[in-house]
From Swiss-Prot:
The keyword Acetylation applies. GO terms for biological process: adaptive thermogenesis; glucose homeostasis; positive regulation of protein kinase A signaling. It comes from the Eukaryota. This is Adipose-secreted signaling protein. PANTHER family: ADIPOSE-SECRETED SIGNALING PROTEIN. Signal peptide: none annotated.
Length: 174
């Protein structure tokens, strides 16, 4: 009987916050120092004719316009184009020579979840033998994990239609 009475009384305990902490939710958000990381697309030269472009987190079934700058490459002239062998999910939109190198604008389609790499080959207009390989790497989240903060140079330009098998319009056989 004593055990039954002991469980019926609610126990109340207080929580104390250390000095300087605000009790109203300031600890529920993650804050990063501005100096820890830049919020821009990162371009890294892997070899003489190969670059890795990291575009951060993207959402599945969305299309993105990605703009980045390649440093000056002696193998390329101002007449750059994409080679005929290209990716289904990465399309070159424009190449503009700048004082820092080349401003590249492309469209990327986030077609599946995970860390994805898509490649494109850039070549000079008259010479197919001199190519530069550009690999775009993205971390694609599924649709249930929220909306990612896009890096500078990445812009969402559209969403692909989702197919959900539970919402089929097919009525079946008669």
């Amino acid at each position: 009987m004593a055990a039954a009475n002991r469980g019926s009384k609610p126990r109340v305990r207080s929580i104390r916050f250390a000095a300087g902490h605000d009790a109203e939710g300031s600890q529920s958000h993650v804050h990063f120092d501005e100096k820890l990381h830049d919020s821009v697309v990162m371009v890294t030269q892997e070899s003489d004719n190969s670059f890795l472009v990291k575009v951060g987190f993207l959402k599945i079934l969305h299309r993105y316009e990605i703009t980045f700058t390649l440093p000056p490459v002696r193998r390329l002239s101002k007449d750059i184009r994409e080679t005929p062998v290209h990716s289904l999910h990465l399309k070159l939109l424009s190449v503009t020579p700048t004082s820092e190198g080349y401003s590249i604008k492309c469209e990327y389609s986030a077609h599946k979840e995970g860390v994805l790499k898509e490649e494109m080959l850039l070549a000079c207009e008259g010479d197919i033998g001199t190519c530069v390989r550009v690999t775009v790497q993205a971390r694609v989240m599924d649709r249930h994990h929220g909306t990612p903060m896009l890096l500078d140079g990445v812009k969402c330009v559209g969403a692909e239609l989702e197919y959900d098998s539970e919402q089929s319009d097919w009525l079946g056989f008669d």
